[in-house]
Amino acid sequence: MSRKPGEMKVVGRPRRRVDARAKVTGQTRFADDLVLPRMLHCKLLRSPHPHARIRRIDARAALAMPGVKLVLTGADMPIPYGILPVSQDEHALCLSRVRFVGDPVAAVVALDEITASEALDRIQVDFELLRTIADPLEALSTPEPKIQPYGEGNVHKKVALEFGDVDAAMAGADQVFEDVFFYQGNTHLAIEQHAAVGAVDPDGKLTLWSSTQTPHYVHRALARVLEIPAAHIRVIATPNGGGFGGKSDPFNHEIVVAKAALLLGRPVKICLNREEVFYCHRGRHPVTMKLKTGVKNDGSIVAMDLQTLLDGGAYGSYGVASTFYTGALQTVTYQVPRYRFRGCRTFTNKPPCGPKRGHGTPQPRFAQEIQMDKIAVALRLDPARLRQSQLAKPHSLTANYMRIGTIGLSECIDRVVEGSGWKQRYGKLPFGRGIGIACSSYLCGAGLPIYWNTLPHSGVQLQLDRSGRVTAFCGATEIGQGSDDVLANLVAEVLGIDPFDIRLVTGDTDLGPVDLGSYSSRVTLMMGHAAIQAAERARELIAQAVSAKLGIPLSRMVFSDRRVFDAEDPARGFSFAEAVQVGEALHGTLGTTGSYRPPESAAKYKGGGVGPSPAYSYSACVIQVAVQPETGWVDVEKVWIAHDIGRALNPVLARGQVEGSIYMALGEALMEEMDYRRLPRHLSSALVHKFPSMLEYKSPTTLDMPEVITYLIEDPDEAGPYGAKEVGQGPLLPVMPALANALYDAVGIRVDEVPITPEKVLRALGDRTAHRCGPKNFPLIAWPDPLRVPPPWEGGDGKAENEGPRRRREGAIVAPDVVQPGLSPHPSTPEGRREPSGVASPASEMPEVLR
C-alpha cells in the first residue's frame, strides 16, 4: 500500500501552508491576544544592579494602591528550577540575590497593566552591592564572590575530550595552523515578545497559555516549583511569532502568572516589553576560540585541537550542553582522524545565554571555515576544491563517534561554485570586490532528551471520524517554522487525503502525546516519523475493512484523491469518509498512535550525549561583497546557498527557512551584538546592556537583504521521514565565515571576529603587518586531564579509556525534578513532601519582606 517517492501526491510538492490564511488575515491568536473574563495583569520589578544581596523588600505602599491585588516575592516560590537537571539554579523571583541588571525581584498583579507598572515604583528594595564579574577573564581570575554557589569559583563547566593522540599527529603534520577567534553574543529578536496567561479551572486545575517552544519542559517546571501534581497542570503553547531558541527555557514570568492565578482564582496575564525580552535573552554565547589544525601538503587534516571559552551570563540555562556543542560537530563536515576539544563556560553578571539558531555551533564553524581558507591560501589550493576533497564519508563514524548518514555536501559545493561563477571570480575581481565560500553541517534533532529516559521523543495520535475528518494530536509547537504544515502533509500523504481535511491540535499537554519541543531542528524528523507511523496504522485498519468488504487483496488497496479503491479497477472503492465508516463498523471507533525515539548513540563516553543525531544536514554558501576601503563599509551583493535537505517535504517552506537563515546570519555577521557598558560611578558603576531596544540593537531590514539564490539538494536519508532532513538552522552556519572569507578576497584582510563592523575593517586595513583584526591570545586555563577515547579506526568502542564507572541507568525514569506532593510522600519532610534538589538560599540570607 505504500507509495514510491515519484507517486507522492503531497510530499515534495510546493503547497500553501495550512495555517497561512489565519496568519495573513490576522486571525491567529498569539498569547498577548488572549483576553479572559476577570483577567488581571502582572508586571515584574527588575533589579537595577548587576550583583547584589536583597536585604529588605517593602511592598506596603504598592499593596495600598487601588487596583493592586497581589505582590509576590521570591519567598513565595522558593523552589529552584532550570531547563537542565544539572543546572537547577533559577527562581521565579530572586530569593536573596540578584545576578544581573533585569533579574526579577518582585511581581505586582493589578486590575490593569498601568496600575501594575505604577505599583512597581512603590516597592522599596534595599540592596547590598557585590562585586560585578564582567567577562570570562574576570570570572577565571576572580573565584569570589561566586555568582552561583556551585561550580569551580565562577567557572560553570569545564570539559576535555581527546580522540586519538593529537600531539603525535601534530608532530607528523607538514604544516600546523593556529588561530584565535572571537564570536560576539547576539540575541534572537523574535517579532513577538514573551507572553503568558495563567488561569484556574472550576475544578482547581491550572492552565497556562504561553509563547513557549517547549510546553513539556514548562509543564515539568511548573509542577516542580508550584508543588502541585503534574496531572493538574495544562500548558498550551500558543502560536509563536518567532522563537529561534529564545523561548526554549521555562521562564520566571510563566511561573509567576501561574502562581498568581492559583492564589487569586482569576486569570493573570503578562506580556514583556522589548527591553525585558533583552533581559530574558538566552541568546548566542560570546565565545573566544583557539583552533589548531595540522595538515599534509595536499590539505588533508591529520589532527585538530579546539579550545573554547564561553561567557554564559548569570545562570546555567542550557550552558552545559552549549559548552559541549562548541566542539561536538567539528568532525562531521570534514575528515578529522584525531581530535581534541576543551571547553569552559563561565558565569558573569549578565543576562544568561542559551540556545540560538544553531545552538553552540556557529561560533566554532566560523573559526573552522576561516582557518580552512587560510590553509587553502597557504597551500595554494582552491578553497572550494580543498573542502570538497576533505569531506567526511557518508555512512561512517567520526573520531568522536557521531554516526553520519547521507552527505549531499559535495553536490552543494558544485551547485554554489557553478552558480556563482566561482572559478571565474575567485581571486580575479578588482580590489574592493571579493567572493568567499564556507560549508557547514547541523544535527536533525538531539539524540538524547534533556532529562534522561527511555520514553519516546515525540508522539502523534490520530482520531478518525465517520465524516471523513482526521484530527491529529501532537505536543509539537508551531513557532512559525511550519511544523503544523509538516504534520498535516505527512498524515495526508499516507491516507490519500488533502492536508486541509486534517484538524490539528498541537502544543497542548492535556490533549496531545508528549513532544519534547521545537529545538535542535528535531520536529520534522521526530514528529514526522511518529505521524507516519500513526497514519500507517490507521490506513492498515481501514484497508483491512475495505478489503474484506469488497473482496480485494490488501496488496491492491490504494489511498489517493480522498478515495480508497482497487488499483486494478479504480471504480471499485469508497470515498475516504465511506471507507472510515466501513473501518469503524469492523473495528469500532478508529484511533491510532505513533511514536519515535532516536537510535542508540555510538558515543559511550561522558559528554557523548551532546552531538549524536539521527541524521545531519549540510550546507555550502558563496557570498560576493563590495568593500569601501575609505569607510570600511561592507556591502553584500549576492548570496548563493545550497542545502542538503534530504528530501524537501514542502519546497516553499524549505526555501523560506533557508532565506530566513541568511537574513539572521547577515545580521550576526555585520551588526548584531549583545554589548554591555559600565555606568558612571555616581550611577552605581552597574554593568548594563548597551542596546536594550530595537532602535539601538541594529538588525538588517528588508532593504538590506541581497539577492539570494537557493538550491535545495535532495540526498534522502533513511533516518528521516521520506528521507527528509532539517532546514531550520543549518543554512545559517556557513554565512558568517563565507562573508569573512569574501572580505579577504576583496581587500586582503582577515577579520577573525564577528560582527564585522566598518571599524574593524578599517583597523585591519591599517594593520600593515598582520592585515588582521581579531583576538591575539587565548587565556591560559587550567584544563582537566581529557577523557581519552580511541577513535573507531583505532579499535575504539566509544568508551573512554580513563573514565571511572558511571551510574547505571535502567528503564524509563521520571526525572527527580518533578515534585508531586501527595503522590510520593517522603516521611522525613514536613507535610509529607520531599525536599527539592537544586540551588537554594540559606534562611540567614533571606531578605525581610514587608507587606
Mark where each language-model region is.
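Thiamine diphosphate
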Residues: 234, 239, 243-265, 269-272, ...
